[in-house]
Regions:
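A glycine-rich (often HGG/GG-containing) alpha/beta subdomain
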Residues: 1-146, 150, 154
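C-terminal-of-GTPase-core extension/linker across diverse P-loop GTPases
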Residues: 2-12, 54, 144-203
Length: 203
């Protein structure tokens, strides 16, 4: 995935803080093209996961906010790609202007769930963790949030992986018997298959 995506990740309601997120190769220099840091940081020298203060510009180059910028380089980011985030005041007008400036520089609007999709495709999380992100966002109780958080931490994936591995072993043995009937392969007996399936079902 070579394109750069951008989106408001905190919603567009009036709030104290709003976050605009970018992901994709080249997103860090793109972020700096609409941001003037107060210090000496550049797209090449900025440290990962360190907030830097500066001026955020709209597509006409006007300063629209005093904001913070943080970056994470691939593969050590949420999506597994280079990422950047602007932490600015949560004015819908500011957030929209920031996005428009980024789109004018070559970014595109991220699709729904696209950051998490990229994290999954880049191996940063498994499918159960990707689903847990949605569950956590939509949680309506502390219990639901706790369950989703556990799943996000990989609890479900840890249960599924050994089951998948065991069933894959059984299937591979069947394929070997069918594909190489003349080879000296120990045949699986029905009771062993039933035991393996029962063991997995009990998980």
């Amino acid at each position: 995935m070579s394109d750069i995506i951008a989106a408001v990740s905190t919603g567009r309601l009036v709030s104290a803080i709003g976050i605009v997120r970018l992901s994709g190769e080249g997103c860090i220099p793109l972020a700096f093209s609409v941001f003037t840091p107060r210090g000496q940081a550049t797209a090449k020298t900025v440290e990962d996961r360190k907030l830097i203060l500066g001026a955020l510009h709209d597509r006409q180059g006007r300063i629209i906010d005093e904001a913070m910028l943080t970056v994470s380089r691939a593969p050590h980011s949420y999506t597994g790609e280079d990422t950047a985030e602007f932490h600015c005041h949560g004015s819908p007008a500011v957030l929209s202007a920031a996005l428009e400036a980024l789109f004018a520089k070559g970014a595109r609007q991220a699709g729904s769930g696209e950051f998490t999709k990229r994290a999954f495709l880049n191996g940063r999380m498994d499918l159960t963790q990707a689903e847990a992100v949605i569950d956590l966002i939509e949680a309506e109780s502390a219990e639901a949030a706790a369950n989703a958080a556990g799943q996000l931490g990989g609890a479900m994936g840890k249960k599924i992986t050994p089951v998948y591995d065991r069933l894959t072993d059984v299937l591979a043995h069947f394929h070997a018997e069918l594909d190489y009937p003349d080879e000296d392969i120990d045949p699986l007996v029905l009771s062993e298959v039933e035991a393996a399936v029962a063991h997995c079902a009990g998980k």
